[in-house]
Amino acid sequence: SVNALKVIAIANQKGGVAKTTTTHNLGVALAAARKKVLLIDLDSQASLTISVGLEPLEMQHTIVDVLKKDGAPVSECIQQLRDNLHIVTSIIDLAPLEMEMLSRASREKILDRALKPVKENYDFILIDCPPQLSILTINALSCADGVLIPVKTDYLAYRGLTQLQDSIREIQE
């Protein structure tokens, strides 16, 4: 049921398929419907952060602060955008964070553990994933109740979709 979909990862290993646009517009629409929404920008291009009108270089607390070893509580990194709509922003370069995450135990559950304390505060948590199957995407898929996969309508996109579905099944087992 839709009510069971609290955490939704918007993912596709291809770039340019409207992951960020989908995340942003779905978040705004749900907030307008009086649902409390948290957006998470996991993309190292910080596209979601930029699309909501924020400047990644000016952010004091970002997803990096949440996911790094001995990181800050996610509650300290949430910014309100408008009524019912909040965001955890990203920065332009997440490569050092990804390298650090890869060296940790239970590395695929880092985001899940970080979000636990705030999950009950939101009706929906929407995660904008990077355009590759990185440790960040694996974290998003591990904590998601569902995955929204935007695709272009062509054969190569369809082939990529089946590969992503296989990866999702593997991660969730």
Regions found by a protein language model. Name each.
Residues 1-173:
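P-loop NTP-binding core
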